[in-house]
């Protein structure tokens, strides 16, 4: 399935605790039987997310690379993506048949975006626990990502969030760009995200 342009590179961003690593895990497990998959994780001072994915058996350890960005995680996915590009080059060399590489950013805010040199497709993850107003606050993560994932929908009643309001605001802020609701802990919404990647990413 490898494209002539190399593997599809999917950037996964979002605030701390929104569910980025959970999404990466679920996507790896959902796609690894059909596609050759690898992951690059970004953490500020540790490789905790990479270790977590290996521990959860999302992929074998040779397919997961953790990079330590230091300081500001935005720089490693936007202004100077060289550390991530080096990790991707290493994966491509080690596993030449790769179809998909997920690049999980460090915890960031609504202003974070991926450099087009780094990611072909971007997914931005937010959580209903952050508040009903998050979609209408905008920011590049909300408005410019190829897919917005609104996670932890099961917790909406407990944090007094109206999912209909979030749905309406997300649609308004994103124009024609799609968004999905998910409960990643239970795997809800994962199939929709995989279908999006297959259609939008040309897999």
Curated annotation (Swiss-Prot):
GO molecular function: GTP binding; GTPase activity; nickel cation binding
GO cellular component terms given for this protein: cytoplasm
Keywords: Chaperone, Cytoplasm, GTP-binding, Nickel insertion, Nucleotide-binding
Annotated Gene3D superfamilies: P-loop containing nucleotide triphosphate hydrolases
Annotated function: Facilitates the functional incorporation of the urease nickel metallocenter. This process requires GTP hydrolysis, probably effectuated by UreG.
Disulfide bonds: none
Main location: cytoplasm
Subcellular location: Cytoplasm
InterPro entries: CobW/HypB/UreG_nucleotide-bd, P-loop_NTPase, UreG
Quaternary structure and partners: Homodimer. UreD, UreF and UreG form a complex that acts as a GTP-hydrolysis-dependent molecular chaperone, activating the urease apoprotein by helping to assemble the nickel containing metallocenter of UreC. The UreE protein probably delivers the nickel.
Family listed: Belongs to the SIMIBI class G3E GTPase family. UreG subfamily.
Binding residue positions for GTP: 14-21
Biological process annotations from GO: urea catabolic process
Keyword hit for Nucleotide-binding: yes
Cytoplasm found in the keyword field: yes
Protein name per its UniProtKB record: Urease accessory protein UreG
Signal peptide: none
Highest taxon of source: Bacteria
